């Protein structure tokens, strides 16, 4: 299954997470029923091309056991692995035990990151880690001056890089257009992790940017926000300003 077939949720707290999961499930419902006094007619199941998962960073203050119990309670089965749950220097035995623990909860680790890379040594470490973990997607934040070296690593390891954007909070990769301008002429395995909330807080139209750059969108972080400015706050899906019903339609249209 292609790594781009997963959507990551990047929510701040448990209440927001629960609301977001419920709202998105409603938006992507696969079965509808029409009832009468004598019969129930079910429409054919529509299989989605994408799945809802969890950004490991959402559980930065929680251990792996708590994280997995929460995912099970939310009926979520995909996790982007963060290094505070599986350290960058983990050996094969530790990685195997980690994957088994995820499997015990019905969870699959589909990517690693975000991993920040400020030197060539950190680029090497990040890609070697992704290979040992056994994933084909690395969510990363390499310094601009390292992109030539990162491109070599992408080719060497045959691992996709999804550069994570930061919105107005950091000067490094503030929005989708900035990432696009830095990867458009590079190896096609170099793309972005589109954080639709951060992107909008920078003043960029996240839905329009998805349409423009969808061929290089390998992962997404989902959050609603209250305003298209730095002052915008995270909000439960449906309580902010992002048009999620239209967003889901776009994911289907462009076969995310």
Where are the regions that the model predicts?
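Catalytic-core regions built around general acid/base machinery
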Residues: 94-104, 149-156, 246-250
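Histidine-acidic metal/acid-base catalytic patches
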Residues: 2-51, 60-77, 131, 176, ...
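Solvent-exposed, acidic/flexible segments
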Residues: 60-64, 91, 120
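Non-membrane alpha-helical structural segments and their capping/turn regions in soluble enzymes
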Residues: 92, 96, 120, 124, ...
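Glycine-rich, proline-tolerant flexible connector loops at the mouths of alpha/beta enzymes
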Residues: 80-97
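Active-site beta-loop-alpha junctions enriched in small/polar residues
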Residues: 55-59, 82-86, 114-117, 143, ...
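Pocket-edge positions in alpha/beta enzyme catalytic cores
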Residues: 59, 87-90, 171, 236-239
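Active-site acidic/histidine proton-transfer and metal-coordination neighborhood
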Residues: 10-11, 16-21, 44, 65-66, ...
């Amino acid at each position: 299954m292609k790594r781009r077939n997963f959507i990551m949720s990047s929510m701040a707290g448990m209440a927001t997470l629960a609301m977001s999961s419920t709202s998105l499930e409603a938006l992507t419902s696969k079965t509808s029923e029409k009832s009468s006094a004598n019969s129930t007619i079910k429409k054919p199941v529509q299989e989605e091309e994408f799945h809802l998962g969890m950004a490991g960073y959402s559980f930065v203050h929680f251990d792996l056991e708590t994280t997995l119990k929460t995912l099970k309670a939310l009926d979520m089965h995909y996790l982007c692995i963060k290094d505070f749950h599986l350290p960058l220097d983990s050996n094969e035995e530790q990685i195997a035990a980690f994957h088994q623990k995820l499997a015990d909860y019905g969870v699959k680790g589909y990517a690693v990151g975000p991993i920040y890379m400020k030197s060539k040594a950190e680029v090497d470490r990040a890609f070697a880690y992704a290979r040992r973990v056994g994933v084909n997607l690395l969510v990363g934040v390499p310094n601009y001056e390292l992109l030539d070296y990162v491109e070599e690593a992408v080719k060497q390891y045959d691992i996709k890089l999804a550069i994570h954007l930061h919105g107005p909070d950091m000067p490094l990769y503030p929005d989708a257009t900035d990432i696009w301008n830095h990867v458009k002429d590079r190896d096609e395995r170099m793309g972005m992790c589109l954080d639709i909330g951060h992107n909008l807080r920078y003043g960029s139209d996240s839905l329009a940017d998805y349409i423009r750059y969808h061929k290089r969108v390998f992962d997404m972080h989902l959050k609603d926000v209250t305003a298209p400015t730095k002052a915008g706050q995270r909000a439960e899906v449906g309580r902010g300003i992002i048009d999620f019903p239209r967003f889901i339609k776009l994911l289907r249209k462009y076969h995310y």
